[in-house]
Amino acid sequence: TVGLYTSPHLKDYRERIKINGNEISEDFVCEFINENKPFFEANELSFFEMTVGLAFDYFAKEKVDIAIIEVGMGGRLDATNIITPLVSVITNIGLDHTQFLGNTLEAIAFEKAGIIKPEIPVVIGEYTSETKAIFLAKAKENNSEIYFSSDLIRESYPSDLIGDYQVHNKKTVLQTIAIINSQKEFKIYESDIKTGLLNVVKNTGLKGRWQKLGEFPKIICDTAHNKNGLEIVLKQIQKEKFDSLHIVLGVVNDKDLDEVLPLFPTKAIYYFCKPNIPRGLDAKILEDNARKFHLLGKTYASVTEAYNESQNIAKE
């Protein structure tokens, strides 16, 4: 059995914790909270720390064979970093959460390198010359074998995740599997790799990764939310054939708008909305800031209203 812990969730909190693709039950979540509430309150644990505790407790009680654990933020001080894994994986480094992790790639790489454990192999997905030096130093300090998947992996397999950026992710996956297979605890066969990569969405439930929601008009949903991610997604959008481009846009209130808004194309119609979460930025504030970068459109009372209106106009 395989446990999967990811964050954040899109619609349902239980998306974060799955075994063999099935979400944790509501009963288990409620029992865990009731049982541990005094401890949580006494120690002032964060929402994320409580959720990590829930995931680990669930995986332990269900006796999963393998657990895939995604770090929440950074790595060195993250609640997930109490484990000793079979292999550590660092996918890429972007300027995100800079108020907590530092405002240079080197500072953020240092935090992410904190998941490198003594004598545990580490796979690096993407790197720059600055971040590579930090990863190499940390691996040497821990006597850990280090693998840069973008330099080592040549073969590829088709996947139901079709964003351009998945090329890098697939290389990282293949390198990680090669290391796990070399440890001889169990074997992941090539047929399993092929099937797995063709069924990522079905097996994980992950949504919003260059996800096609419709064909007439073509509708793409992507949850890219930092400069690196947006640059890649917007570049891929420009490769698409279209007569007109309609962008439904909502952000959270701590987003650096002066950094991300200049990335968006001016030749598009914008539908500004507020995500239905406490951290959502008011749509009017977003529209006012977007106008400074010549991104023009209207504000809508909800994401659903903006989405429906964009479809109606695109069909005309």
Residue ranges and their predicted role:
Residues 3-83, 101, 130:
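ATP-dependent carboxylate-amine ligase catalytic core
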Residues 66-71, 79-89, 93-97, 107, ...:
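Nucleotide phosphate-binding/pyrophosphate-handling subdomain across enzymes
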Residues 8-35, 99-116, 122, 136-137, ...:
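Active-site-proximal loop->helix
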Residues 128-147, 218-220, 261-315:
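C-terminal helical cap/extension that packs against the catalytic core
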Residues 75-77, 84-143:
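Conserved catalytic-core segment of NTP-binding enzymes
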Residues 5, 121-126, 248-249, 268-276:
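Short internal beta-strands
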Residues 59-65, 237-243, 310-316:
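Glycine-rich phosphate-binding loop signature in dinucleotide/nucleotide-binding domains
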